[in-house]
């Protein structure tokens, strides 16, 4: 690192100041493009400024000193004994009774490394302790500043430094350090995952697959509470929203329990859809609801929208086509003590809208009470939910309700467009046959992949779309409205309430 700065021909200290002479500023910023090409040397952070040199150097130094041995490169089967390494650390000897006071004074120069004790016993003197110091900050006794030397003198501690051979083992390295040392140089390292109870859910790339079992073992070893690591082997199934997975390490048991926003959910992760990255979104929708509101959850999964809404004293109708999701939805309603507040259905989304949703809307929107609850419809099936909006066209008969009582839809979707908000609005407009330009909002949920966003478009269903007579009078030139299949029952699919059975 020092060589890099020397090659560029100016002092590292230049970047450590917050203000510099104009001539120095010109030199600094002409070097920015070149410095950005030097890995781990120069960073432009999200603060839109220059990262301070202490931050950069600390990271580089740490990776140099505490990197695993080079001969683990290419390891396919984890051998923990191969990670042994000895490093030389400067230490300061002090009487054990003054160690606590001394440590407070030496925070600047003490060794900062998770999993390594900064104070150890002196093998040659049981009444003394050895304080481990930062090997880059503490080269000699002259490296102490004036205040630190004053404390040493006050406590009668000699500033003389000694060297201690510290043995590092597999347990002392972080997961990203291990994987960076093992995987081929220059390739992306997977150290993150989605946690689903005791399960670490990884989504490995092709170049990481030869090391998949080692990666899974490292994830289990380095993350307390994780006892199983799995990798997705196929895309999400569009029918039931689950995916094929391979157990990389640990137990095969996929029955798990998670806590999200103070609610508990239990399910078989191999058979249902669950995404812990949607926790904030589940909470956001819940915040939009008021006690007494009505929520229709068209693709309810195991209940992350339905259950919080029910606990907020909303009337909830929750549906999912997947029989496993339906089973665990019933179970979780009971588990969270809202089984009497949620009506659960196991139907196709279109049938659910044309059946239970239609029947309830006809009933509720036709009431004459002055204070009517708001109606919300959540459609969390990003790959296909936009298509289901067509079911709302000419869904209701009779006299239209007032505008403020029209149901509010929260529809999730994906976009790869450069203007994703505009894109999803246009998609929804194309399906509904009306403009949503001034009557909708689009919320960015999360980035799914490079150039792929997940969004939620929220809007009230226009009267011209929702009511049959309005649709016919305003859109005679469009396709005939969808007709609900007639059955002997008011709607196909009976609601179920969670029970002991």
From Swiss-Prot:
It comes from the Eukaryota. InterPro entries: MeTrfase_TRM5/TYW2, SAM-dependent_MTases_sf, TRM5-TYW2-like_MTfase, TRM5/TYW2-like_N, tRNA_Gua_MeTrfase_euk. Pfam families: TRM5-TYW2_MTfase, TYW2_N_2. Coiled coil: none annotated. It catalyses: guanosine(37) in tRNA + S-adenosyl-L-methionine = N(1)-methylguanosine(37) in tRNA + S-adenosyl-L-homocysteine + H(+). Residues 474-501 are annotated as: Disordered. S-adenosyl-L-methionine binds at residues 282, 320-321, 348-349, 380. One of its GO terms (biological process) is mitochondrial tRNA methylation. It is found in: Mitochondrion matrix; Nucleus; Cytoplasm. It is an enzyme of class 2 (transferase). Its main location: mitochondrion. GO terms for cellular component: mitochondrial matrix; nucleus. The keyword Transport does not apply. Monomer. PANTHER family: TRNA (GUANINE(37)-N1)-METHYLTRANSFERASE (PTHR23245:SF36), TRNA METHYLTRANSFERASE (PTHR23245). Involved in mitochondrial tRNA methylation. Specifically methylates the N1 position of guanosine-37 in various tRNAs. Methylation is not dependent on the nature of the nucleoside 5' of the target nucleoside. This is the first step in the biosynthesis of wybutosine (yW), a modified base adjacent to the anticodon of tRNAs and required for accurate decoding. This is tRNA (guanine(37)-N(1))-methyltransferase. The gene is Trmt5.
């Amino acid at each position: 690192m020092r060589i890099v700065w020397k090659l560029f021909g100016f002092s590292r200290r230049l970047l450590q100041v917050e203000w510099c002479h104009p001539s120095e500023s010109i030199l600094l910023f002409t070097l920015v493009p070149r410095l950005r090409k030097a890995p781990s040397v120069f960073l432009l952070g999200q603060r839109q400024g220059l990262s301070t040199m202490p931050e950069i150097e600390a990271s580089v130094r740490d990776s140099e000193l505490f990197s695993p041995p080079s001969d683990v490169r290419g390891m396919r089967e984890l051998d923990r004994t191969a990670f042994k390494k000895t490093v030389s650390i400067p230490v300061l000897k002090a009487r054990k009774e003054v160690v606590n006071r001394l440590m407070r004074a030496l925070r600047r120069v003490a060794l900062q490394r998770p999993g390594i004790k900064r104070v150890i016993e002196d093998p040659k003197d049981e009444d003394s302790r050895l304080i481990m110091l930062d090997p880059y900050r503490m080269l000699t006794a002259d490296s102490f500043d004036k205040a630190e030397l004053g404390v040493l003198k006050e406590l009668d501690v000699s500033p003389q430094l000694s060297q201690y051979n510290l043995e590092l083992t597999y347990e002392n390295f972080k997961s990203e350090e291990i994987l960076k040392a093992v995987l081929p140089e220059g390739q992306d390292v997977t150290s993150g995952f989605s946690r689903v109870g005791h399960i670490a859910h990884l989504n490995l790339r092709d170049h990481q697959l030869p090391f998949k079992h080692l990666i899974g073992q490292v994830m289990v070893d380095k993350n307390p509470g994780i006892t199983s690591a799995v990798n997705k082997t196929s895309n999400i199934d569009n029918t039931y929203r689950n995916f094929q997975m391979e157990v990389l390490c640990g137990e095969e048991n996929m029955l798990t329990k998670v806590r999200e926003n103070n609610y508990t959910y239990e399910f078989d992760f191999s058979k249902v859809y669950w995404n812990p990255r949607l926790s904030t979104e589940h909470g956001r929708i819940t915040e939009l609801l008021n006690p007494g509101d009505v929520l229709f959850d068209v693709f309810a999964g195991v209940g992350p929208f339905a259950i919080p809404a029910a606990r907020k004293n909303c009337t909830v109708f929750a549906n999912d086509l997947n029989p496993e999701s339906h089973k665990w939805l019933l179970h979780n309603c009971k588990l969270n003590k809202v089984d009497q507040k949620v009506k659960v259905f196991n139907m196709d989304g279109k049938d659910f809208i044309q059946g239970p949703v239609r029947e309830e809307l006809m009933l509720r929107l036709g009431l004459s009470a002055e204070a009517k609850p708001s109606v919300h419809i959540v459609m969390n099936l990003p790959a296909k939910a936009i298509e289901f909006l067509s079911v709302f066209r000419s869904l209701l008969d009779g006299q239209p309700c007032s505008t403020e009582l029209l149901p509010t839809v929260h529809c999730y979707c994906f976009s790869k467009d450069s203007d994703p908000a505009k894109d999803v609005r246009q998609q929804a407009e194309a399906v509904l046959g009306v403009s949503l330009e001034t009557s909708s909002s689009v919320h960015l949920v999360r980035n799914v992949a490079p150039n792929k966003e997940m969004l939620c478009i929220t809007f009230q269903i226009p009267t011209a779309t929702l009511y049959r007579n309005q649709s016919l009078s305003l859109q005679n030139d469009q396709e005939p409205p969808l007709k609900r299949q007639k059955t002997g029952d008011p709607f196909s699919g009976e609601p179920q309430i969670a029970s002991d059975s």
